From Swiss-Prot:
Principal location listed in the UniProt entry: virion
Cytoplasmic side of membrane: 1203-1241
Signal sequence residues: 1-13
Extracellular compartment segments: 14-1181
Species this protein is from: Bat coronavirus 279/2005 (BtCoV)
InterPro entries cross-referenced by the UniProt entry: bCoV_S1_N, BETA_CORONA_SPIKE, S2_sf_CoV, Spike_N_sf, Spike_S1_N_SARS-CoV-like, Spike_S1_RBD_bCoV, Spike_S1_RBD_sf_bCoV, Spike_S2_CoV
Positions of region (Fusion peptide 2): 803-823
Protein name, entry field: Spike glycoprotein
Residues glycosylated per entry: 65, 115, 124-125, 162, 231, 273, 298, 322, 334, 361, 575, 588, 629, 677, 685, 769, 1042, 1066, 1102, 1126, 1141, 1162
Amino acid sequence: MKVLIFALLFSLAKAQEGCGIISRKPQPKMEKVSSSRRGVYYNDDIFRSDVLHLTQDYFLPFDSNLTQYFSLNIDSNKYTYFDNPILDFGDGVYFAATEKSNVIRGWIFGSSFDNTTQSAIIVNNSTHIIIRVCNFNLCKEPMYTVSKGTQQSSWVYQSAFNCTYDRVEKSFQLDTAPKTGNFKDLREYVFKNRDGFLSVYQTYTAVNLPRGFPAGFSVLRPILKLPFGINITSYRVVMTMFSQFNSNFLPESAAYYVGNLKYTTFMLSFNENGTITDAVDCSQNPLAELKCTIKNFNVSKGIYQTSNFRVTPTQEVVRFPNITNRCPFDKVFNASRFPNVYAWERTKISDCVADYTVLYNSTSFSTFKCYGVSPSKLIDLCFTSVYADTFLIRSSEVRQVAPGETGVIADYNYKLPDDFTGCVIAWNTAQQDQGQYYYRSYRKEKLKPFERDLSSDENGVYTLSTYDFYPSIPVEYQATRVVVLSFELLNAPATVCGPKLSTQLVKNQCVNFNFNGLRGTGVLTTSSKRFQSFQQFGRDTSDFTDSVRDPQTLEILDISPCSFGGVSVITPGTNASSEVAVLYQDVNCTDVPTSIHADQLTPAWRVYSTGVNVFQTQAGCLIGAEHVNASYECDIPIGAGICASYHTASVLRSTGQKSIVAYTMSLGAENSIAYANNSIAIPTNFSISVTTEVMPVSIAKTSVDCTMYICGDSLECSNLLLQYGSFCTQLNRALTGIAIEQDKNTQEVFAQVKQMYKTPAIKDFGGFNFSQILPDPSKPTKRSFIEDLLFNKVTLADAGFMKQYGECLGDISARDLICAQKFNGLTVLPPLLTDEMIAAYTAALVSGTATAGWTFGAGSALQIPFAMQMAYRFNGIGVTQNVLYENQKQIANQFNKAISQIQESLTTTSTALGKLQDVVNDNAQALNTLVKQLSSNFGAISSVLNDILSRLDKVEAEVQIDRLITGRLQSLQTYVTQQLIRAAEIRASANLAATKMSECVLGQSKRVDFCGKGYHLMSFPQAAPHGVVFLHVTYVPSQERNFTTAPAICHEGKAYFPREGVFVSNGTSWFITQRNFYSPQIITTDNTFVAGNCDVVIGIINNTVYDPLQPELDSFKEELDKYFKNHTSPDVDLGDISGINASVVNIQKEIDRLNEVAKNLNESLIDLQELGKYEQYIKWPWYVWLGFIAGLIAIVMVTILLCCMTSCCSCLKGACSCGSCCKFDEDDSEPVLKGVKLHYT
């Protein structure tokens, strides 16, 4: 059976003059393959460097279905295909071919593919590239043939004429010999036909494929832009057949894959050389849309707003009156005679169905112009009435039958109003209407619209003139019949409607509706309104239609918008997974399957509208996340108390389920300070943590050179810009205000940094310095100089037993042995002996030795204290040395570890701040060069203003320039608005930074997690570019313990509340403890207070939820009127207004590293065995004191003796009378100057 089938599929091409014939050609299999990420191309000629660029154009969507076609010859010519059907061109084509024998030779582009229309041929004839646009007589099976490896025939077309484009590229030699083995070549092309140009893009990749289409990413470059100027709706491929003879040609193996381009948004990544290195199809899936929204290939964990959507209508409601009669247009248009123009006649048409398509599609009319309505829309409209006015005029006068025209016909015969709604239809009747017809050539006053004057004279003057119509006169003077159809808009029930069938009325669903020509989308519900009999529609205060009368049932219906809301994407971060969940905000899950436009999105999106993982929340419909009926600590807050988390293995999810789970948010999670019934967890141990917090306090200052940004060097544009008044001045004034605000923010924040001074201890009184006598008040344990003079001081290292020894010993040296201490199981004494101790122990030793002989050894017992105290002191020395050694080793090891961690911490902090500085500086540079950047979103750039002026007259040129100015002013206004918003955010951040500077740096905050994570110890500020960095040192709980707690304790009818802390119970008793650390204390009146009784009063806090304020809108028509009066370019597409790559600071990795370093630092805390410092003061012996006192007495006696021997005792105020040693002789004074004598007093 297979052999027979293969035989039927055998293809054979025989020679024919000019063309070849293929017999028994099988139908293409048209299998589908995925395009992967191929087909990206440079859609413009602009150089971009190191930037992410969003662009809207016709692209091949990623993972599109490509249709596969073959040139195939397998199994000894029994299995052959030669697929070259005519394919749809659409909005553009992606074409890829895998081959090895140069089978694909080119393409034919056109519409009808016959000689009635032009077609374009781009082919490779093995020596040249031929490009031609002609009327071709194309072959039914266009192909090339190769015989024995040499090009033989060109069976593409038989003849050509009316050629408008002919181009032959330089010669080359194509290898036409058939090859065996795998496919070696992958050639990709993109074809776009825009504005008369066929653009061709191409890339080549070497492959080694036995079959199929290779996955991957490819970028195509432009190679041709051909000015064909023809209509291209279809195309087909020109391929090659091969033979070892001169006939019976057969195909060789090749495959090509085609797909159509679609208008979509791509994000292209350019490197510093301007090369596209990566791309994202923004409509491929929610994650791709998110990447385009935030303009980043890497997305951090969180929930992001991406776009908006409106629920798609599921049905169409068409409601027209029940009218079946046909409108009598034939009687109007086929009348035997038309009246004179000054006596024009009117026919009212009503209660009928009007098929305007018969008129619109007629080829006999020379004029068919409509005003206020589109001819193609008439079939969908209804009117209260239609009036047909008929008359006869010259062909050249038809132009006067239009709104706002003047002339003899428009002024004195038939006048249309300026707001005319209707159509003017005219056709030549030179053969039918002959003879004399009349028109009014003069009238004292011009006619009003639709005014008719049948008089033939005015004040005795004959005002009518004659038309002499004959077929032989020039065309402009020949008879022309005119029918003016005036449409009366609905102010009463419709009586004239298009031939459209009505459908059933659908309520409470999102539908497309058409009521008597009023088209729209919304939800129809029964209304409580009451219309007057002549009223058909209702409008709200903003002039929007909000109600309608059903023309069949006459029921009043309210029209409300279909569900509309935002779309948010929940992602665990691209570094963790590509899984996402989608939240349709404020939408019921029943509406979600209809909210996605399936024709605009790929199947990857539609998967989120089906399946079991659909979760209705108060925030909207969450799809793509598994709902877990439990409460956990919130990871990604979604809203309305719902959170999401990503888990690879957890109790939150079972094997095989989605990685994203949704659950109800709890106040806390396991292993955290959480609340469960009346239990509370209180920390019992802590660890040190360092948190880095970067807070911006200013942004880069910018100003805009308005004239240069908008007009460049164009003088005409600058003059036109003056008409916009002080816009630019106000803009820069706003930017100046922002700059002043930044200076103010910086000043206020860093003004908080003050030098902290300590008050010195008071050491003098009344000018006398007692610091050497009195103890230092800041060091109450320190002795004064006098005390140090009067006592010998010995300082020893204390391993932990000397202090207790000193307290035991006191001033009694005899207690030395009794006060021995225990340390690590050993009895120890300090390695210190006073003279008294030495004398005592020496006396005991000598006595014991001397009496040992005659006390039969009993006296040797006196040697025991001496030996014991020596042994104990050796123990003390040993343990002290061991502790010192171990501590020294720990200090060395841990200090080295701490130093390395601190060094790494500083390096990490430096890297983070450097990254912050780079981003801020780059952004500032981008903002400061705003005046040099020219947006391309408004259709014209300032560099071509002179070209606009040269191609257009002054008025048209000013219109085009005005469009440019309007668009750019919108761009600048939006930019300044963004800056104002950012300035407000920075202001709030600066205020918070100032608060943290006061509370965290200059004080110790009691607020948990306000100054870092945990309980605050200290903070250090550091200036950063446009901000400040805080290094918060905190201690965080490392161990916790659950206690039963109560807000108050009721005792004897009174409620006792803790003054500070909380009441806790250990199971048997109640205590009071600090909230942030477990330190139980007995409950007393000092740490509690009594307030009220034991009754519990429950209060409800106001929980009113306010709806968003909706501004009162003016009339929509008035808004449009004001807009069109003040702006000549209402259709402004802002697009990517700023062109600024606003980089986002990402120092999370560095901060995580800092946290890890802080943890390591905390682990490196040195747990040394405490070595105290023991000081012992030893009193002098009695003979020292005796000598000291004798020396003082001797000094006093010698002083008195000297005074008496020198007769100076009188100076002691009469204490002795040894002479007048203090008396002075006045006569010994000699005058220095004559008449002057010095006196000493």
